[in-house]
Amino acid sequence: MKMRLHATTTSPFVRKVLVVAHESGLMRDIELVPTNPHTDESLRLDNPLCKIPTLILANGEVLFDSPVVCEYLDSLHHGAQLFPKDGLERWSALRLQALGDGILDATLSRRMEIMRAPTEQSPEWIERWMLASSASLDWLEQHAHLLEEPIRIGHVAIGCALGYFGVRFPDDDWRTGRSSLAVWFDRFDTRPSMRATSHEALSKLPPTQIKSGGPVARQ
């Protein structure tokens, strides 16, 4: 029996899980369940937070959110691991994952705020989320050497964050003044796992038709 993943094709956190599934060669073991977390109350039966991604295991157990789901998937294969087992390398990978997830949180919050009626928007919160994103991108530019390590979960989180930021706020031009980060992202974005889960690729297909790119070698 396959695992079942509550998902939408637009969620960057779902994309993060799918990238890990591709990297681990597990896409064939996952059935994607199209789910709108805002309207589908059946999701709450599996996850009281009613958030995606939510993974239902073959034995009926349920896992959420993306860091938990990603680490679980990474534990199911015997290839190079995205989650180091221990030591400083593990904490470095988890720190980068937290930063990437934080950029995604700020980007999503900012987008939701600007979709409100102009009279209901909070300029203070919009500014705060913009600052969180720009400061994080500056930090990554200053610490770009951390991205040259073997591919870990932090790289996946940062890659998904940059991809989503570029789609939702293209006018921000995050690349200006961050050439090292831009070079890294352009290279990372060519990975089969990133290509198969790009915004353009997923927007053309219903979730149940997402194809597996198979496992790929780590850098």
Regions found by a protein language model. Name each.
Residues L45, K51, P84-K85, I153, ...:
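Generic structural "secondary-structure junction" signal
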Residues C70, D74, L94-Q97, L137, ...:
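Non-transmembrane alpha-helical segments in soluble domains
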Residues G100-D186:
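GST-like fold's C-terminal all-alpha helical module
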Residues R175-Q219:
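Long hydrophobic alpha-helical segments typical of transmembrane helices together
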